[in-house]
Amino acid sequence: MGTTIMEKTIATTGREVHLSKVILLFCLPILFFSCTTKDVYHTFNHIPERGWDKRVIERFSPVIEDTISTYDIDLSLRYTNYYNYRNLWLFITCEAETGEEFTDTLNCVLADEYGKWFGSGWGASYQQTISYKTGFNFPRKGRYSISVQQGMRDDVIPGITEVGIKITPVTSVAGE
């Protein structure tokens, strides 16, 4: 009668260790480290429950040490069913310590024309990551200020619960 992998053992200095435990011991660290990203910066700001007032500017302060690498800058939004629109207009300003700055207007599409929310979610809460800049080079080392302001017609918009910024170095794919 044959034995299964679970029944096989390896003899090690007088002790027996199940092969499945040995495999698990070697595979677990590989899985753990392969699933982690090397974000340079990733943080969320909480929006008050009453809503995001257009006069309130959400600020983020990443420190960039490597100006040779290129980065992807993503905007993360957390929102609920109480948000009344399909999209969200944002004004984003990035400013270096030297005073250099650039401003963009970003249209974030949160739902399709039938009201089905994009992104991942559970219950009445959703999260979506939106690409803001891809392959971006920061011109100088130092602290940057990234400001995000809602640009909708309503002064206060309910349903947006958090806004975040994630900066990740671009990794080259083998063979490029």
Give the location of each predicted region.
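Short acidic/polar inter-strand loop motif in beta-rich domains
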Residues: 79-82, 127-130, 135-137, 150-160
